[in-house]
Amino acid sequence: MSTSIRICSYLLLPLIYLLVNVKIAQLGESFPITIVTFLPVLLLLFLERISVKKLMIALGIGAGLTAFNYLFGQSLDASKYVTSTMLFVYIVIIIGMVWSIRFKTISPHNHRKILRFFYLVVGLVVALAAVEMTQIILTGGSSIMESISKYLIYSNSYVLNFIKFGGKRTTALYFEPAFFALALISIWLSIKQFGIKTPKTDAMILAGIILSGSFSGVMTFILFYLLEWAFQYLNKEAIKKKLPLALISLAVFLVGVVIAFPYISTRLGDLGTEGSSSYYRIVGPLVMVGYSLTHIDGVVRFGSLYEYVASFGIFNGADVGKTIDNGLYLLIIYFSWFAVFLSLWYMGKVIKMMINAFGDNRNFRVQLYLFTPVSLFFTGSIFSPEYAFLIVCPFILRKALNITR
């Protein structure tokens, strides 16, 4: 494949970030089709070589988890089993392909072109979010958000209702604030794979996350920035040579945290408030998780989640919730202790990376691998191609840039 065609192919990645939630068509009630529905085919555009062994390992793990869920899970709604299982298998295929593919290398002289497209995407979505927030402040509603919602995979009516009661959230081109923040962090990590400092873009992405009103997004950005500060400056060589710079950068960061502290403290307080989004995402579902880990009938088959969640009577606002907004909890409900052991194994790998990253965290390596488990706390829609794209895109670029560590 020629260089020009290769570049056009990789320029698809920032474009997909703009279109990831735009609905092309609909199959049934719960299967919207978007550009990332065709992600396995799109990955072939970047393919140089594939390890069949790795792909078979990934598919084997997916098949084992599917069999476990079918054999030990209780079925509460058999009509949705096939669709839900297909989504899980699809995610396994996407992750397996990204892990097993050797991607075509992006030549250095083309880095700037791809980065410009990413900068353009960031500028567009953050500017749109700013316009939405301005309209919300001035009018108490958002006709812009309502108009965009008609073209998205899911309705954001609950966000619009939240705004009517005085809330301030934005979604830009995405179906919910948390997914908007998740997309911005994914873009941020994609840009960081190019190994350059982008303070203006960092500031714009942080502004977008704040405009989204996503507490998970704000805390993740703070965590990732603190980690990078620690990796850069908490080693003997850096302390000797860069101590003033380290103190100045930390001071500036802490000023930002102090300014944001009222918001952070309010959202932390919401963890104990039944009916709040924070409570529903983190605290409320713990009773379900505990039941899944301690009872034989605690595992739920694919497609039966709504009925299982509703049976616990946990309120999300004024209504009893029927969904799980926490991906880790969802995995435990579907796979019980397998999800726990796999999560602990993965986090063990990340912790080893952290220990060795002081003074050598090349291109945000630790943050990239930490992004996968952290992203589980943003949404329960983890068995969707849209979520999968946000997770794998930075990895695709890292491999295409030949970053081996």
Predicted features by range, described:
Residues 115-140, 163-213, 219-231:
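Alpha-helical transmembrane segments of multi-pass inner-membrane proteins
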Residues 42-44, 365-405:
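Transmembrane alpha-helices of multi-pass inner-membrane enzymes
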Residues 210, 214, 316-354:
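A conserved mid-to-late transmembrane alpha helix and its immediate loop/hinge
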Residues 195-198, 222-234, 239-249, 334-373:
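Hydrophobic transmembrane alpha-helices and their immediate junctions
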Residues 264, 269-335:
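Long extracytoplasmic/lumenal interhelical loops at the membrane interface
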Residues 41-47, 76-133, 346:
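Transmembrane alpha-helical segments and their membrane-water interfaces
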Residues 1-74, 241, 352-360, 400-405:
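Transmembrane signal-anchor hairpin modules in multi-pass inner-membrane enzymes, especially those
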